[in-house]
């Protein structure tokens, strides 16, 4: 993997920085593991905008990822590493000994031809998936389940990981990259190691059009709008917002907690916020 600073042949390429991985597969993805997805453009079933700054972009197939890793005791060989337009991490196509192929999140350090395993008897090696009760304390893990059998939900982005801090009774404590410490059931599964493509954060888009390819639309400042469109809008000439920063719907935007899921609050031992 290399970081390439593009030659400034145009204003759009002057600040562009690419992350190039020559190990990625250059052909088409595995057709049996593709699914269609239509662009929602940030709208719900009523056509109302529920997520701003989304729309357009290139058409993409969804790659069906195996987040459960439930084929216990069956060795799998990494056939190739691939780019996935739907996520920051790369994915790996693995071939199981029984002939089935699946996509998984590509862990850091996993190479083509390497053998992976799942289950409680799998060795503690990068890319193997085990129940947390079988993982030694202090191990770096990723793709962590929040409920047993539901599939990985935490630490799935490029370069992310978590650390298994302790086990007590039916629950273990896991420290996430944000600093939050959560309780996770010991029957939940996790994958050893870190997520690959850790240099993803070093890339520079370079121009606005590259974000439009990705389906990201422009972000307009509230003070540049009319008062009917935003609480910061209006005024003669360039004026300040006149109040603390808020969203278009009046919710404070700096430091205001918006978490509403009280059901799982008991699973948070230490919040990522220090205060």
From Swiss-Prot:
Acetylation keyword on record: no
Molecular-function GO terms, alphabetical: rRNA binding; structural constituent of ribosome; transferase activity
Chain spans, region Disordered: 224-257
InterPro entries the record matches: NA-bd_OB-fold, Rib_uL2_dom2, Ribosomal_uL2, Ribosomal_uL2_bac/org-type, Ribosomal_uL2_C, Ribosomal_uL2_CS, Ribosomal_uL2_dom3, Ribosomal_uL2_RNA-bd_dom
Gene Ontology BP annotations: cytoplasmic translation
HAMAP family, A to Z: Ribosomal_uL2_B
Biological role stated in the UniProt entry: One of the primary rRNA binding proteins. Required for association of the 30S and 50S subunits to form the 70S ribosome, for tRNA binding and peptide bond formation. It has been suggested to have peptidyltransferase activity; this is somewhat controversial. Makes several contacts with the 16S rRNA in the 70S ribosome.
Membership in a protein family: Belongs to the universal ribosomal protein uL2 family.
Subunit field text: Part of the 50S ribosomal subunit. Forms a bridge to the 30S subunit in the 70S ribosome.
NCBIfam families (UniProt xref): rplB_bact
Entry-linked Pfam families: Ribosomal_L2 (PF00181), Ribosomal_L2_C (PF03947)
GO (cellular component) term, any one: large ribosomal subunit
Gene coding for it: rplB
Keyword terms: Ribonucleoprotein, Ribosomal protein, RNA-binding, rRNA-binding
PROSITE patterns: RIBOSOMAL_L2
Record bears the keyword Ribonucleoprotein: yes
UniProt name for this protein: Large ribosomal subunit protein uL2
SUPFAM superfamilies, alphabetized: Nucleic acid-binding proteins, Translation proteins SH3-like domain
